Regions:
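Non-catalytic C-terminal accessory region of glycerolipid acyltransferases
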Residues: 2-9, 142-273
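Flexible, glycine/proline-enriched loop segments at strand-loop-helix junctions
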Residues: 85, 131-140, 171-176
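Structural motif
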Residues: 81-83, 127, 160-162
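Membrane-anchoring hydrophobic helices of lipid-metabolizing enzymes
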Residues: 1-86, 93-95, 102-106, 122
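Glycine-rich, phosphate-binding/catalytic loops in enzymes
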Residues: 98-101, 177-179
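Gly/Ser/Thr-rich loops at beta-strand to alpha-helix junctions
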Residues: 86-90, 167-168
Length: 273
């Protein structure tokens, strides 16, 4: 496993412009907090996924307050699915692995290929590519990811989804919220017919991150490492919802109807009493 999440060789392969400009790449890494990401990964890559994720919050001096976590304690052995909003883009994925992974070590999360660069968490990830429709090779990655996800659940293991497939964005009502949950993800849930647990992450990234997303999603993506390390001494609030049975979901016959239902169930957890 590579010690770095992203290094100079990775960058020059992705962008030939940087060939022979290692000093410039290092300056960019420092500006974007990629150097901090690489340092954390190199020091902790030996840890299993839940411990690797938990230690990140410890090093940030952040606390995680989980409401209704007893739901996870009462889940019987066997497969289930979690669905969550996606306000952070990185820390919510790590928090999910921390929270659910400490209850079930076989828990995996479906993520974008970008997060799959975190080598220490690859055993906990099933990667797909958000731009799969643009490239046959990327489509193959996504097809494999979907196949792996379905096999994982059918073999009796739990799986986490961020059904929006992208980080939450600013709405016309000036709220930061997920886009419509993607029918492709909801179809998987419909086919698997296992219990679903909604998990809501309170809060969001900085307004700089949000504004960059309105310009170009790639600019927002470059900002992700900074958005991890600017969360020092924060309280992260997470609300776990009650289990939704396959029978309850069966009354919603289309992916759009079920997606709207599951999203509403998740956002109903937003109020923190």
């Amino acid at each position: 496993m590579k010690r770095a999440v992203l290094d100079y060789d990775d960058v020059r392969k992705m962008a030939p412009f940087f060939e022979g400009k290692e000093k410039l790449v290092n300056r960019v890494f420092h500006w974007l907090a990629v150097d901090k990401t690489n340092d954390y990964h190199s020091r902790n890559m030996h840890l299993p996924g839940p411990e690797f994720s938990h230690k990140m919050f410890d090093e940030l001096g952040a606390t995680m307050t989980i409401r209704n976590e007893e739901v996870l304690n009462s889940i019987p052995e066997g497969p289930f699915i979690t669905v969550s909003n996606h306000p952070y883009g990185a820390l919510d994925g790590m928090a999910l692995i921390d929270i659910v992974g400490h209850h079930r070590s076989d828990f995996k999360v479906m993520v974008n290929m970008i997060l799959n660069h975190i080598g220490a968490l690859r055993p906990n990830f099933i990667a797909v590519d958000a731009l799969a429709s643009d490239d046959p090779a990327k489509r193959a990655v996504s097809v494999k990811g979907i196949t792996d996800a379905m096999r994982h659940v059918k073999q009796g293991h739990p799986l986490g989804f961020f059904p929006a497939g992208a980080v939450s964005k600013l709405t016309w009502g000036l709220r930061i919220e997920d886009r419509e949950w993607q029918p492709s993800v909801i179809r998987i849930i419909q086919k698997l017919k296992v219990p679903v647990i909604p998990i809501y992450f309170h809060g969001h990234n900085s307004w700089v991150f949000t504004m960059l997303g309105m310009i170009d999603w790639r600019l927002r993506t470059l900002r992700l490492p900074t958005e991890v390390f600017n969360k020092t001494n924060r309280e992260f609030r997470v609300s776990v919802g009650n289990v939704i049975s396959p029978e309850e979901m069966a009354q919603y016959t289309t992916p759009e109807e079920l997606g709207a239902f599951l999203k509403q169930k998740t956002y109903n957890l937003k109020k923190w009493l």
